[in-house]
Amino acid sequence: MLDYRFPTALQMVLSAAMAEQMGERSTSAILAYGLEANPSFIRKLMVPLTRDGIIVSTLGRNGSIHLGRPADKITLRDIYLSVIEDKKLWASRPDVPARCVVSANACWYFKSVADEAEQASLNVLARHTVASALEAVKNADTSGCDPVPEMIARFKKAH
């Protein structure tokens, strides 16, 4: 089963950062619209992101979602660890009976390789911040899309 928590959380945080840069509001409804995701999934991901100080959410009619600290102080590793928590990158098979040299040693060997790969991935994510990721996205953009979802413009017209 594919796990979309990290890429969705990354897009949420980048969207909130973009909205902040533009002086616009960001809400769970706006994020859900921009991500074409279920609003309940967005709210579920907001829990660990808020707990870990990555985002701050204010309630009420004018409530919004903001970054919990400066964009250059939030790494992609922070976001990943927040939403993935203790789930391993790759799950190893349960220990199997030792019937030959391979079955006696494959589990520990796989775990050591998986741990090394996971650490390498975390090191890469630690080198990227929300600020650098947002700058890269903006610099590479050729979509012609508005910086924030058009839902914000519709929201402004209604209020």
Residue ranges of model-derived segments:
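Short alpha-helical segments that sit at the start of domains
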Residues: 1-13
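C-terminal regulatory/oligomerization modules of transcriptional regulators
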Residues: 93-159
